[in-house]
Amino acid sequence: PDQITMCVAKNTSLEVLNLLNIFAHKYTFFKLRQPEPQKLNVDLEQNYLLNSGLHDSKILASNMCVLIGVNPRYEGSKLNLKLRSRQLKGNFNVIHLGSLVNLTFYNANITSSTQILKSLIEGNNLFCQGFINSLNPILISSTEIFKRKDSFCLTNMLRLLIKHIDLFSQHSSQSQLNTLNLALNDVGFSNSSNLKTITNLDFKNSTGIYFI
C-alpha cells in the first residue's frame, strides 16, 4: 500500500504515541511525523526541563531573574505569580530578553536580538553590571527556542552566558537554564522519539494523512 502518514503534536498522550511507534516499526508504509521542527538535544534532561529545585525558597533567595524569549504571564501563570510576588517584596531585578509584554510586574526589557545576547556574553552590555555580585540568579526560557533554526547555537550561547554569570555572582549552587514547557506533555513528547517534520513529499506520497 501507499504511505499512510500520522502527524502527531505535543498534546498527544504517551500511550497513543507509543502505540503509533509500534505500528511504524511493524509496517514500513506507516510514517510518523510532527508538524513543526524542533532541534532539541535530549541526551541531558536539564536541556529541556524546568529545574525541580526552582521552588518558592529558591526564588526568595534570589535577587535577579533573566527571562529569555518567554512570557510567563501566558506560558506559565503559576511561575509568573511567584515572580510577581517576589518582585513586590523588593530587591529583585527582572531582565526580560524578548518582545515588550506586560508581565504584571516591573521588568527591564531589552530586545530579543542575538546581538544583544552576544553583548551580554562578551560583557559589553550595561546590564552586565547587574550580574556582578547578584545573588542566586535565575535564568528561564521556554521550549519555543528549540523551534528556531539556530537553536543549537542559541542554547550554546545561553550556556556561555550562564558560565560567565556564575563567575561573578554569589550562588549556593551552579546556575542552569530552566526551560518552561508550554504543553503538558512537552517533556514526554521530546524524550520519546525524534520525529521527522512533515514535508510536501509526505503529502504527495500519502493516500491518507491523519492529524492527531
Please describe what each predicted stretch is.
Residues 1-212:
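Catalytic alpha/large subunits of respiratory electron-transfer oxidoreductases
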